[in-house]
Every structure is written in structure tokens, then in C-alpha cells.
Design a protein with these regions (language model features):
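Polar helix-capping/helix-linker motif
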Residues: 9, 131, 154-155
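Sec-exported extracytoplasmic/periplasmic mature domains
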Residues: 66, 72, 76-79, 106-110, ...
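Extracytoplasmic/secreted envelope proteins and their assembly/folding machinery
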Residues: 68-75, 98-102, 115, 132, ...
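C-terminal cap of thioredoxin/glutaredoxin-like
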Residues: 141-218
Length: 218
């Protein structure tokens, strides 16, 4: 029965080669230029000790609306060293109005309520949310009276937030939404290969890549 030992060795080696091949395939599952882009000029993140993920979106984008159903459960699973936040797109006057809506909600501390509310109003109810009276009515539904809404939406803080969002659009060369920027270095957008349901898989891959880099830097 001496042949048993060589047979076991061959099986063991075959299994090791399989694991090696599988791990390499996993490591190379997402590659630059195919699944994500490397930004020409990295941007400064708001907390260098964390891996930053910024979602550039628009309330009027149906793909952003679809992604939101993935974003909500996903962000609850993020490690403490990952900083996730949203930045509203600002290509044209309509988007800038919606950006002002978003940053007004942030200033009022009702961002988590307004996001699903605005998506529902625009995507499912067919509302535009662009006129003053329409926006006043919309915010009143969240307990914000007209005077308070007008004061906040025209404040220096909200004006500056919209301006900064516009600057980020230019800096990151955003041409479509949803787009996610990982740690100021990588841009992940929907493509034929990366659909809405896979965007966060690519982001997770890049998060781990940056977490390893940060860990090796300390």
C-alpha cells in the first residue's frame, strides 16, 4: 500500500495549486481601466486616517435610485475606519436646485429622511421639486416651515456646500452618476461590465486595498 502516500501528496499539491489559482483570480477580479479608473490627480480626503468613499448622485437619476437600495444596508456594514458620504451632482440649473435641496436637508439635520423622500417624490410620484412653492411644501412634510426652509436654503453654509459640490464635479471629472470616489484615488462608475448591482463590490475591493495601504503606513 506504499502508493497511498504519493497519492495523498499529489492530492494535497493539487489542492494547494487550486487555492493559489483561486486566490490570484480573486485578487485580480477587478482591474484598473476595466472596472474602475485611477484619478490623474488624487484629492485630499476629509480624514486621512480613514478610507473615504464619496457617492456622487442625483435625485433625478434612476440608476442612483436603484443603487440607494444597495447603499442603505451596505453602509451599515462598513468598518469604523471607512468614511462614507454623499455629494450631489451639479451639471445644470435643475441639478443645482436638487443639490440645494440636499444640502439644506443636511444643514437641518434631516438628511436621512429627505434622501428617501426626495427619491420617492421624483422617481415614483413624478414630481419635479424645482419650484419654490413645491420645495416649501415638500419640506413642510418633514416638519420644516417655510421661513425656516428659506433661511437655511439661502444661507452661506448651503451656498458654499453647493459650490464645493460643483468643484468636486470638476476635480473628479464626473461625467455620469452614480459615481463613487474611493479615498480620493479611484473612480467607480457603471459600465457594461459593472452594473448597479456590482458597483459596491468594486468599491469594497478598493476599500480593502486602501485599508491595507493605510495599515502598512503606520
Amino acid at each position: 500500500m506504499a502508493f497511498i502516500k504519493p497519492l495523498l501528496i499529489r492530492k494535497h499539491l493539487a489542492w494547494m495549486f487550486f487555492l493559489l489559482f483561486f486566490s490570484c483570480a480573486q485578487a485580480e477580479e477587478y482591474v484598473a481601466g476595466r472596472h474602475y479608473e485611477i484619478l490623474d490627480s488624487p484629492s485630499v480626503t476629509r480624514d486621512p486616517s480613514k478610507v473615504e468613499v464619496v457617492e456622487v448622485f442625483w435625485f433625478g437619476c434612476n440608476h442612483c435610485y436603484a443603487l440607494e437600495s444597495y447603499i442603505q444596508p451596505w453602509k451599515k456594514t462598513l468598518p469604523k475606519d471607512v468614511d462614507f458620504w454623499k455629494s450631489h451632482a451639479t451639471w445644470n440649473p435643475t441639478l443645482k436646485i436638487h443639490a440645494r435641496l440636499f444640502y439644506s436637508a443636511k444643514a437641518l439635520g434631516i438628511e436621512d429622511k429627505i434622501i428617501p423622500g426626495a427619491f420617492t417624490a421624483i422617481q415614483r410620484e413624478g414630481r419635479f421639486l424645482t419650484g419654490n412653492s413645491e420645495l416649501e411644501y415638500f419640506f413642510r412634510g418633514f416638519g420644516v416651515e417655510k421661513e425656516k426652509y428659506l433661511s437655511v436654503s439661502n444661507s452661506f453654509g448651503v451656498n458654499n456646500a453647493v459650490k464645493q459640490a460643483d468643484n468636486r464635479m470638476r476635480q473628479w471629472t464626473i461625467t455620469g452618476v452614480p459615481t463613487l470616489i474611493v479615498n480620493g484615488k479611484y473612480k467607480v462608475s457603471g459600465t457594461r461590465e459593472v452594473g448597479t448591482d456590482r458597483l459596491l463590490d468594486v468599491v469594497d475591493f478598493l476599500i480593502e486595498k486602501e485599508r491595507r495601504f493605510l495599515a502598512s503606513s503606520y
